[in-house]
Amino acid sequence: MVRRNLQSDFVGGAFVFPGGAVDLADGGAEAESVCRGRSDAEASILLGVDSGGLAYWMAALRETFEEAGLLLAERPAGPALLAGDPEEEARFVAERARVNAGTRRFLDVCRDESLQLLVGEVHYFAHWITPMGAPRRYDTRFFVAAAPPGQQAAHDAGETIAETWISPRRALEGHRKGDFEIIFPTIRNLQAISRFATSRELLEAAEAASSSVPTIEPRVLSDGNGVRIVLPGDEGYDDVRVDRPVGVAPNFNDAVRAISRAANHDDGATAGGVSAPPLSAPPTSAPPVAEPPLAEPSEGAIP
């Protein structure tokens, strides 16, 4: 996980999975030519979109490279990528800096280095949409993948200011204690991951379920019992006012933090003890899209 810059507009200082917006260069035939293991048609079916689905995978891998320095790719012939060659590592550090600065396309790095992005090993895991009424909304697809062997994660010292490998249970416990800030969708994703004993089990389950990932669009309310999140299917979900994400917190970041502090159970319960099945199909609205992937070492246990 990486820690967001303290000056970020959205929950600065929180720990998140690497991610960001899908760029135009993430899609199209040129991008598909550097991807292996999944076609645009296959990706689009999984996401429930007409076309352009592969761009989400491309964005996830690009953002993981930009923010965490991990590159889920390989050359068709040759040694493992970034596995101890100092000259190669220095070259990719420089390429990463150029991509982050906007002077070099990630696509061009892959093409010039003869890389194939391992999109077939990255599995669609979760879909969250920011509650209606929020001043800034995100339509976010989450992915899981094994970390590439031999590579060392490193934050970018720009959008992110720290990185850590941490087990889901430790992250959730740190959140409960107040010394590891994470937000509600991250909490729920970590709760889901924590149910698996190993990364291998998680990846196998994610692959098997990737064609039926539900969309979760919470609604947030404040009443005499405090701040609560209601999910699709919960009693009162359709009655929640949507003109403000949290009635007692007009500042969006304060609202997000209040909700996330309340969601302090690691048994799947939501804030206020409300839990329910999510939607089975995406809504018709299409706010901006962000693509954070999740990653764990491929053989490591998940304590």
Report each predicted region and the residues it spans.
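N-terminal leader/linker segments that precede catalytic domains of diphosphate-processing enzymes
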Residues: 1-287, 291-303
